[in-house]
Design a protein with these regions (language model features):
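Tandem CBS (Cystathionine beta-synthase) repeat/Bateman regulatory domains
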Residues: 1-341
Length: 341
């Protein structure tokens, strides 16, 4: 029911060749800064990001939901492709968002066991969740460009994109915003520096500055899950009575409920739930709206986080800037003739 797929190794020589060809092509442009990141993404394939070795967990849709989430925890992964044995193909992804949706949909009280989580199979949950709406799996070929991958991630508002070999039907890797930005950062020092890198978030209007979803220390966990479901955000800054950020509760933190087997009591506060973090937490990573895009990119990549909380001098929350915001700005907004795709 749970299996690991071997991933193919990428050829480092081919990556170097692609990059040299990309740099060579820049010398023939009247303005070497023009569309630099867009052209970089168009000159590299998804295959170039497939590591020599990585863990890929695949679930059969006949697996029990509870076992699947426990398997995510034990394997240290955030999502898994779903294989339908009847159709003999991949049909979707199981993510932490599914776990949140199940908990929020079926939770009643600490005294009532969540039967649907305990007994439902993945295929049963998909039938309930999707109902009559058909949502095909969004995937990409290893030979497709990284530009196509970024476009697909942003267009479909997804965080994980399976790279599937069209010949074998095997899933080779799961592409994410983080992995793509990290790959770009490897080469960014060798590329021309566009002027917009020296502009601030405020000047470029990058990030979300209005209707920021936040929670307080005493917010019930069930209410926080409701915000995740209704507003489709991936993290909630935890603020004090003055609006100052004191912590952050992300979708990834919710999986700790499975790890600790504490998902039957969602009446506890967000603060109480955060005490169950499985990893060391160094604090909320923040930035200011007057910091440059270059500084923001460096901080995101070096800290390996998905977002920064934008604060003012008093640490009051003013916005959020995410990896998807950055890729949108680098590759699409400032990449295609200054137009947003």
């Amino acid at each position: 029911d749970v299996k690991a797929e071997p991933s193919r190794a990428f050829d480092s020589r081919s990556i170097l060749l692609y990059f040299l060809m990309f740099v060579f092509s820049l010398s023939f442009k009247p303005d070497p800064e023009y569309n630099v990141y867009t052209r970089f993404m168009k000159s590299h394939r998804c295959y170039d990001l497939v590591p020599t070795s990585s863990k890929l967990v695949v679930f059969d849709t006949s697996l029990q939901v509870k076992k699947a989430f426990f398997a995510l925890v034990s394997n240290g992964v955030r999502a898994a492709p779903l294989w339908d044995s009847k159709k003999q193909c991949f049909v979707g992804m199981l993510t932490i968002t599914d776990f949140i949706n199940i908990l929020h949909r079926y939770y009643k009280s600490p005294l009532v066991q969540i039967y649907e989580l305990e007994e439902h199979k993945i295929e049963t949950w998909r039938e309930v969740y999707l109902q009559d709406s058909f949502k095909p799996l969004v995937s990409i070929s290893p030979n497709a460009s990284l530009y196509d991958a970024v476009s697909s991630l942003l267009k479909h508002k997804i965080h994980r994109l399976p790279v599937i070999d069209p010949l074998t039907g095997n899933t080779l890797y799961i592409l994410t915003h983080k992995r793509i930005l990290k790959f770009l950062k490897l080469f960014i020092s060798e590329m021309p520096k566009p002027g917009f890198l020296s502009q601030t978030l405020e000047e470029l209007n990058i990030g979300t500055f209005h209707n920021i979803a936040v929670v307080h220390s005493d917010t019930p966990l069930y209410a926080a899950l409701g915000i995740f479901v209704d507003q489709r955000v991936s993290a909630l800054p935890v603020v004090d009575e003055n609006g100052r950020v004191v912590d952050i509760y992300s979708k990834f933190d919710v999986i700790n409920l499975a790890a600790e087997k504490t998902y039957n009591n969602l009446d506890i506060t967000v603060t109480k739930a955060l005490q169950h973090r499985s990893q060391y937490f160094e604090g909320v990573l923040t930035c200011r709206a007057n910091e440059t895009l270059k500084a923001i990119i460096n901080r995101l990549v070096e800290a390996e986080v998905h977002r920064l909380v934008i604060v003012d001098e008093q640490e009051v929350v003013k916005g959020i800037v995410s990896l998807s915001d950055i890729l949108q700005a680098l590759v699409l907004t400032n990449g295609d003739d200054g137009k947003t795709t």
